A protein has these predicted regions:
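A cross-family detector of function-defining hotspots
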Residues: 32-36
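Acidic glycine-/aspartate-rich tracts in secreted/extracellular proteins
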Residues: 15-17
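Extended charged/polar low-complexity repeat regions
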Residues: 10, 30, 45-458
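Predominantly extracellular/luminal regions of secreted and cell-surface proteins
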Residues: 2-13
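Short, polar loop/linker segments at the starts of domains and inter-domain junctions
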Residues: 20-31
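Eukaryotic proteins' extreme N-terminal regulatory segments
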Residues: 1-2, 20
Length: 458
């Protein structure tokens, strides 16, 4: 990401885990997920938010302006169509910061995991209608990520293709600083054609490194266990416009990506065209990563069992680990033969480690509430620390240490910490302005530090 207000952050995560309802394969290939992959299904009896990890979070249908909160996911979902939220509502300030055309539209949905933002704006992409489509076309029964909005009213916008092979895919982004980025996407057929051209060039020039065999690069992708795959991949990200430096645009992409013949992410290059990451996959299980490497570091390798779980992590320059899976317990043994046992309770997204047997024979325990939030910890000496939580937000309201001493925490309507009262009765305080920025801190000794902001939108 380039620094600035509400910057465009292009991130990716990998998981070999496959849910029962896997999400469609995204622009980085099977197993890889990007934050922009989220989608909201709009049904008559429910709203279903599908995140980039294949999870399905269910909500009740919402009326215009109505909000709902998921305690287990710490996530708010709000439907547009209302100018204000009620006084004292956790999201009242954040809602008021939205541009009117966003918060007043009943066709938009907004999600956030913090009362300080940002909002994820869930809308729809404009598509070119077909010759047989009825006009005006009805809105689709789903919403996709179309942008972000922060608490200062700044927005980041995703531009999606309206027609062709890339219809619905993000190909452009404008961030909060007005910078414009172009995302270069390719199809499997285009990558196969490029492989054929490289092979032809290498045959005509014996000094050219030999590329992947064109015969091994099919025009269509093999099926995987990671969900439907259109074969569209991100190949490069370019900075196209920067209002601060309009004449100093880079002559190379900010990042570049290459892929295997199976559409798996193979390598990542930075703006100097230096390879910074490399990945390898199981030929029998497309998308299952078996090795990865950072530039200048040794390669980390993984072995899996028949169910697709990692059973060994091999590090040639450090500790390696073996994993044994049993009912409600996982045994981890390192290359020095030290063993740790993790005992779990709960299922699916609420599975938690409740007991750890450490290599030295000591045991620690943890307790959780019904939403999977930490409520207690017991150390190896049997000393127990308890955490009181706000039932709705999950914020810590008090901590009781093993000696019975209690520390209390207080928050404002936006879930921002305003005061901490220590066991000795001394108090520290924080104050915020209307947009939620910290303006003063008062220590336990009564000393106050004040903060001033030159820019009302900083």
């Amino acid at each position: 990401a380039l620094p600035g207000p509400l910057p465009f952050i292009l991130s990716r995560t990998y998981s070999s885990y496959r849910t029962k309802t896997p999400a469609p394969v995204g622009i980085f290939g099977p197993g890889w997920k990007a934050p922009s992959d989220i989608r909201l299904q709009i049904r008559d009896d429910a709203l279903v938010l599908n995140d980039n990890g294949g999870r399905s979070i269910h909500f009740e249908p919402l009326l215009p302006g109505e909000a709902v909160y998921s305690r287990s996911e710490s996530l708010w979902l709000v439907r547009g169509g209302k100018a204000t939220q009620p006084d004292g509502h956790t999201l009242a300030r954040l809602w008021a910061s939205l541009p009117p055309d966003i918060r007043l539209s009943p066709h938009l949905y907004l999600a956030t995991n913090s009362a300080q933002g940002p909002w994820w704006i869930l809308g729809w992409s404009e598509l070119v209608p077909g010759a047989e489509d009825v006009l005006p076309a009805p809105l689709p029964p789903y919403r996709v990520l179309t942008g972000l909005a922060d608490r200062f009213g700044r927005t980041l916008t995703y531009r999606r293709e309206a027609a062709g092979d890339l219809a619905g895919e993000i190909t452009g982004v404008t961030d909060g600083a007005g910078r414009e980025f172009r995302l270069v996407l390719t199809t499997q057929a285009q990558r196969a054609e490029e492989a054929r051209k490289q092979r032809t060039a290498s045959l005509s020039s014996p000094d050219t490194p030999r590329p992947l065999s064109a015969s091994a690069f099919p025009d269509t992708l093999p099926g995987t266990e990671y969900g439907p795959d259109r074969g569209i991949r991100l190949s490069a990200v370019w900075l196209m416009h920067d209002p601060a430096y309009p004449e100093s645009l880079p002559g190379a992409p900010l990042a570049r990506y290459t892929y295997t013949e199976a559409g798996e992410l193979l390598a990542v290059y930075d703006r100097s065209n230096t390879q910074v990451r490399a990945f390898s996959y199981d030929a029998q299980h497309p998308g299952r990563m078996v090795a990865h490497r950072y530039a200048g570091r040794p390669e980390m390798r993984y072995r899996y069992d028949d169910t697709g779980r990692v059973v060994e992590q091999l590090n040639p320059a450090g500790l390696s680990y073996r994993y044994l899976y049993e009912q409600d317990r996982i045994t981890v043994t390192d290359s020095l033969n030290r063993r740790e046992v993790l005992h779990t309770e709960g299922g699916a997204g609420l599975k938690r480690v409740v007991k750890k047997e450490l290599a030295d024979g000591s045991v620690t325990r943890s307790g959780y509430d019904a939403a999977g939030r930490l409520t207690a910890q017991t150390d190896a000496a049997g000393r127990r620390t308890e955490y009181g939580l706000n039932v709705v937000s999950g914020d810590i309201t008090d901590i009781t240490t093993p000696d019975g001493r209690e520390t209390k925490f207080y928050y404002n309507d936006g879930n921002q910490l305003t005061a901490v009262v220590s066991p000795d009765g001394l108090e520290s305080r924080r104050e915020y302005d209307e947009p939620g920025r910290l303006v003063s801190e008062t220590s336990r000794s009564g000393e106050t530090v004040r903060y001033r902001y030159d820019d009302a939108h900083s």
